[in-house]
Amino acid sequence: MSTDSIGTGREDYLAMLEESGGRNRIAGYARSLGQEVDADAVHRSKSEFFRTALAGSGLTPRPGVVDTIAAAKRDGARVGLVTTTSPGNIASLLDALGPDIRREDFDVVVDAATVSAPKPDAAAYTYALDALGEEPAGCVAIEDNGAGVSAAAAAGVPCVAFPGANTAGHRYDGARSVVDRLDPAELLPRR
């Protein structure tokens, strides 16, 4: 079956985002339709499309993100980017967000090449905590999806859910709050 054989509408796509791990998500969706696909090839095509779409998108940071990173750095906090997407997707995203948000803003970047298990597994957060030399209770995670909130909780990191347009319908059990913008005064632990 070709990589373009699975057609999905927006509602199907949003439902698929409940599960982390693009390849797993694609394979699971195909199985639910009684189809067999080369999930790796479909995922590669999707990622190439994503990167191309980001390149000239004029993407801007979500409300409060730049201020929160700046306040954390100003207060001497270490900042991590903890995801289980591919390094290529992260590079494309940071290129699109630059110069407002740059890779250099983060003391550690965890991605799919760093850990083998996607969220909701705690591995990405455990790795970040070790790399930063931090205890979970002294940190705060900001997550935009249910699997990310579950991963932070599994690692013992308090989490604030910050849903985006594609994840507004997720369940955020375990989040200490759900917000539509980041406010450094409410998020950052006092140092």
Give names to the regions the model predicted:
Residues 9-13, 40, 82, 104, ...:
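Residue-level detector of family-conserved "landmark" positions at structurally sensitive sites
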Residues 1-63, 70-75:
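N-terminal helical cap/lid subdomain that shapes the substrate entry/recognition surface
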Residues 77-78, 83:
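A structural preference for short, pocket-lining loop segments at secondary-structure junctions
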Residues 66, 70-71, 86-191:
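Asp-based, Mg2+/Mn2+-dependent phosphohydrolase catalytic module
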Residues 15, 61, 79, 117, ...:
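Conserved SAM-binding loop
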Residues 14-15, 79, 180, 185:
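Intrinsic-disorder/low-complexity peptide segments enriched for small residues
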